[in-house]
From Swiss-Prot:
This is Uncharacterized RNA pseudouridine synthase aq_1464. Keywords: Isomerase, RNA-binding. The keyword RNA-binding applies. Pfam families: PseudoU_synth_2 (PF00849), S4 (PF01479). One of its GO terms (biological process) is enzyme-directed rRNA pseudouridine synthesis. Residues 4-71 form the S4 RNA-binding domain. Belongs to the pseudouridine synthase RsuA family. One of its GO terms (molecular function) is rRNA pseudouridine synthase activity. It comes from Aquifex aeolicus (strain VF5). The active site is at D106. It is an enzyme of class 5 (isomerase). Its EC number is 5.4.99.-.
């Protein structure tokens, strides 16, 4: 196993957030192989080095790769919300490892969230270099005609730059509304809502159904499941990593 910075190791082992782990180190509460470390630059090999916090040994957590179907009206954050709104932590209480969401969905947006304690994979999923497509179902006000759909495919200038979907299609009409499937590989804030709103079609409901090769499928709202080895192999490959299946003991 490769060496990692001590603060990253402590964070991924579920001891504390990376920032709080740095505080523990600076306070002299962390030992590596029996010696107190106070430098944030120290690296450890989790398979060889013995790491302790306040005299208690710290063991690396097994890597977890989970997808959650986030319902509407949940904040994409761990811990309690200061204003009392529900957070996704309430939905993953039965996961013993400390996992974190990869990216976020707005409070009113539903659908696919990836959660993991694999920092390298998370960083690559979010990095624009890998251009992982995110697929959404958007229910918008009004009927989108073919002329407007063609204009949408050509893109439009928004306040933070030009935006053009990788793909967009009409799924069906629902009364006076239109259900669209729209794909972006960018991760700009409120991009889908702002893009469709620029064409005069306000988003009434938004749901993410895929991130790269990972699809939400029939997972019920508020439920989570582990990614299987086939899905993990595809996801790792999509971001330039090699997936090595965990050996069963």
């Amino acid at each position: 196993m490769m060496e990692v910075r001590i603060n990253k190791f402590l964070s991924e082992a579920g001891v504390a957030s990376r920032r709080k782990a740095e505080k523990l180190i600076l306070e002299g509460r962390v030992k590596v192989n029996g010696e107190v470390v106070r430098s944030l630059g120290v690296k450890v090999n989790p398979e060889v080095d013995i790491v302790e916090v306040d005299g208690k040994p710290v063991k690396p957590q097994r890597k977890r790769y989970i997808i959650l179907n986030k319902p509407c009206c949940y904040l994409t954050q761990l811990g309690r919300s200061p204003d009392g709104r529900k957070t996704i932590e309430e939905l993953i209480k039965d996961i013993p490892e400390r996992v974190f969401p990869v990216g976020r969905l707005d409070y009113n947006t539903e659908g696919l969230l990836i959660l993991t304690n694999d920092g390298e994979l998370a960083n690559r999923i979010l990095h624009p270099r890998y251009k992982l497509p995110k697929v959404y179902l958007a229910l918008v006000e009004g009927k989108v005609d073919q002329k407007t759909l063609k204009r949408m495919k050509q893109g439009i200038e928004l306040e933070d730059g030009f935006a053009k979907p990788d793909n967009i299609r009409i799924v069906r009409y629902e009364g006076k509304n239109t259900l669209l499937e729209i794909t972006f590989h960018e991760g700009r804030k409120h991009l889908v809502k702002r893009f469709l709103g620029a064409f005069g079609h306000k988003v009434k409901r938004l749901k993410r159904i895929a991130i790269g090769p990972i699809k939400l499928g029939k997972l019920s709202p508020g439920k989570w499941r582990e990614l299987n080895q086939g899905e993990l192999a595809q996801l790792f490959k999509a971001v330039g990593l090699k997936y090595v299946p965990r050996k069963r003991r």
